[in-house]
Amino acid sequence: MNTQLNEIWQKTLGLLKNELTEISFNTWIKTIDPLSLTGNTINLAVPAEFNKGILESRYQTLIKNAIKQVTFKEYEIAFIVPSQENLNKLTKQTESAGNEDSPLSVLNPKYTFDTFVIGNSNRFAHAAALAVAEAPGKAYNPLFIYGGVGLGKTHLMHAIGHYILEQNSSQKVLYVSSEKFTNELINAIKDNRNEEFRSKYRNIDVLLIDDIQFIAGKERTEEEFFHTFNALYEANKQIILSSDKPPKEISLEDRLRSRFEWGLIADMQAPDLETRIAILRKKAQLENLTVPNEVIVFIADKIASNIRELEGALNRVIAYSSLTENEITVELASEALKDILSANKAKVLNCTTIQEAVARYFDIRPEEFKSKKRTRDIAFPRQIAMYLCRELTEMSLPKIGEEFGGRDHTTVIHACEKISEEIESNSETRRAVSEIKRNLLGK
């Protein structure tokens, strides 16, 4: 974001604060971040689609008028929810408008190390990201971050970009999604601009590519990225990649997969209750919102899936409070989230549904759990299924044993103890159990 735009926005906020009630200003206006100026349009980042809808229908004219008072000029404004797709569109518009700045893609101003909440589920990934940001090209190269949807991978990617530029603004940092990389390559081939494409991606200091798993199966993209990777790596330039799965589970050429494993691999898990509470407190603090502690604990306890849905639930509660002009209480939060909570309750968990979910994850048949087979490809998933039956249902140990081919309750105890130990010591097991639980709970 440029300095001029920031000054305009700060003055605009001053005007809007005098026009609106405190709760309306804090709920809707203070959550906006100025992103960029494209032609005659000011692009404003908002936290969710719900906010975007309210702002467009109720506050757009007010904001435009305030900006006009500050600048003495008529500007259009665009509210953007900073998903990768929208950021890609914005980057493309900015480039077409003749922006000759460094090749940095639009970074979400909210995604910094300062706003990242550290917990057991992401501590290692955060430490690795910070180490890379402090010494790009020298610490871990490449850094490969993986984990499920909405767990903070993109936040860390943006945070690395921000940190590097804060330390040295002359660094050429390029952040893109794998989809954008692929689309630019296709256009370069079509328009005979291959050298221009290669120059863009190989004459930089730091390359961050989100969702790298999507290049799998795209032969030309894999080939081009292989050579891009080599060029940057040999020049000691930093490469950071993110994915929803570890390199060995992505269907890539062996030579590319092995390169992804050259540096450091860090996984991110679903946040535990304490981290979820800390995330909600941080969000409320950053947006200057007063949310009672019991409401934060209530939301954190009910929404255990991922950070994106967790923050979305808080936004929903705050919006509901603002629109109904009622105080934020546990009762109000329960009412605001009733469709989400009832959907979660509707999920019936029993041994059969757990066995099916585990079997689906490991690509085996549920009947195998009741067989006498003891090979690891069957025994290990069976132990995970037993562990989840024990954790997620009220079934007794003997009853669980019956559901697994009439096995003794001591076998179930052994399975639960083994998987508990594996979760503590093995990130692959931890990730598998976490993902299966998310699938089961619909989170």
Curated annotation (Swiss-Prot):
One of its GO terms (molecular function) is lipid binding. InterPro entries: AAA+_ATPase, Chromosome_initiator_DnaA, Chromosome_initiator_DnaA-like, Chromosome_initiator_DnaA_CS, DnaA_C, DnaA_dom, DnaA_N_dom, DnaA_N_sf. ATP binds at residues 150, 152-154. Residues 106-321 are annotated as: Domain III, AAA+ region. The keyword Plastid does not apply. Keywords: ATP-binding, Cytoplasm, DNA replication, DNA-binding, Lipid-binding, Nucleotide-binding. One of its GO terms (biological process) is DNA replication initiation. It is found in: Cytoplasm. Residues 1-75 are annotated as: Domain I, interacts with DnaA modulators. It comes from the Bacteria. The keyword Phosphoprotein does not apply. One of its GO terms (cellular component) is plasma membrane. Residues 75-105 are annotated as: Domain II. Disulfide bonds: none annotated. Domain I is involved in oligomerization and binding regulators, domain II is flexibile and of varying length in different bacteria, domain III forms the AAA+ region, while domain IV binds dsDNA. HAMAP family: DnaA_bact. Oligomerizes as a right-handed, spiral filament on DNA at oriC. Belongs to the DnaA family. PANTHER family: CHROMOSOMAL REPLICATION INITIATOR PROTEIN DNAA. Plays an essential role in the initiation and regulation of chromosomal replication. ATP-DnaA binds to the origin of replication (oriC) to initiate formation of the DNA replication initiation complex once per cell cycle. Binds the DnaA box (a 9 base pair repeat at the origin) and separates the double-stranded (ds)DNA. Forms a right-handed helical filament on oriC DNA; dsDNA binds to the exterior of the filament while single-stranded (ss)DNA is stabiized in the filament's interior. NCBIfam families: DnaA, PRK14086.1. This is Chromosomal replication initiator protein DnaA. It comes from Acetivibrio thermocellus (strain ATCC 27405 / DSM 1237 / JCM 9322 / NBRC 103400 / NCIMB 10682 / NRRL B-4536 / VPI 7372).
